[in-house]
A protein has these predicted regions:
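Active-site-adjacent structural elements in enzyme catalytic cores
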Residues: 1-339
Length: 339
């Protein structure tokens, strides 16, 4: 199949809407990362996503909508917590896991009795949903295990062939996938950190948001993934990545000791020139927002440069930085050295 990459025009929006109605795949920009969309109600269409990505089918997908009225049939109930969070953060990079409704395909939900739903803020996604009338399932538009793409060229690098259309909306603003929170049960639970933080949700809800252990640790054998990004190696370049936890002086000393051909540094802005190895900087120290915006592009650039071993500066573990750490520790296959 020849994959077209088209700029955002009324004609390309109409083509994307038509393809989705016909059960085809479309890659398109969101505020978080580029996604591959298919009609969430059409199991055969959704199977094409798993095939295109090489993604295991026990990994659930998120359903995207453009209005609260679209929740009907997708979820069986909208808990009060969900209404509060939607009022505060929708449209935006927040996914809520709710009881599943009858219209969502089993394939979309990986057979679970819950479904993750979000209302993206990106105008292109909203236009495509409105014009197609399709609530679509959409994971990130990368081959499974690789860093998520935040622009159309990186999307094409992974998806040239398996789908007919990529809409080019430029760079994504956030740079990491949406926050995922389960809003049923005794307490809300953060399943995947993102741009909407634990602290922000607690301020809206007036109660504690628990943090799933799987955010910072591997899932245990036999444990079910309730959200994308909880299972399998994710976000990884070809190089072996190790996170070095400690201040810059100790980081620099460790990198100097282990410098060799093929070794690269993934560091914060302004640090690379002080290191004896090639480097890529991925945002300001203590600034999770800039780190999130640059992380996936930095990981893909390491592949383009042929890096074999990467020593990464360790982000913090609160606010948006928790999302950066969550993605980076999976890219590193949980290799962390405390200095």
């Amino acid at each position: 199949m020849n994959t077209q990459v088209l700029p955002i025009t009324p004609e390309s929006i109409a083509l994307a809407a038509k393809l989705l109605q016909q059960g085809e795949l479309v890659a398109l920009p969101t505020e978080t990362v580029y996604g591959i969309a298919a009609d969430a109600r059409n199991g055969e269409a959704v199977k094409k996503i798993f095939e295109a990505k090489g993604r295991p089918q026990d990994n659930p997908l998120i359903v995207h909508i453009c209005g609260m009225e679209m929740l009907q049939g997708i979820v069986s109930e909208v808990p009060e917590r969900a209404k509060k969070l939607a009022a505060a953060f929708w449209p935006g990079p927040l996914t809520m896991v709710m009881p599943r409704g009858p219209e969502v395909s089993d394939v979309t939900c990986a057979g679970l009795d819950t479904v993750g739903v979000r209302m993206p803020s990106h105008p292109v996604v909203q236009q495509v949903i409105r014009e197609s009338g399709v609530a679509f399932a959409a994971p990130s538009a990368n081959l499974s295990g690789k860093p998520s793409p935040t622009n159309a060229p990186d999307t094409l690098a992974d998806m040239d062939g398996p789908l007919p259309l990529i809409l080019d909306g430029g760079e994504c603003t956030v740079g990491v996938e949406s926050t995922v929170v389960a809003v049923t049960g005794e307490h809300p639970m953060l399943l995947r950190p993102g741009y909407v933080t634990k602290e922000q949700m607690e301020a809206v809800l007036g109660e504690e948001v628990l943090v799933s252990p799987a955010i910072l640790e591997k899932l245990k054998d036999g444990e079910v993934a309730r959200s994308p990004g909880m299972k399998y190696k994710h976000y990884a370049p070809k190089a072996q990545v190790t996170i070095l936890r400690g201040d810059f002086a100790r980081y620099k000393a460790y990198v100097e000791q282990h410098a060799a051909p093929g070794v690269w540094a993934l560091c914060f802005d302004g640090e690379g020139a002080q290191l004896p190895v090639p480097f890529i900087e991925y945002g300001k120290n203590h600034d999770g927002v800039t780190q999130a915006h640059h992380l996936f592009t930095a990981l893909r650039d390491l592949d383009k440069h042929g890096a074999q071993v990467v020593y990464a500066r360790c982000p913090e573990q609160d606010g948006v930085s928790m999302a950066v750490y969550n993605r980076l520790i999976r890219a590193a296959a949980f290799r962390v050295v405390t200095l």
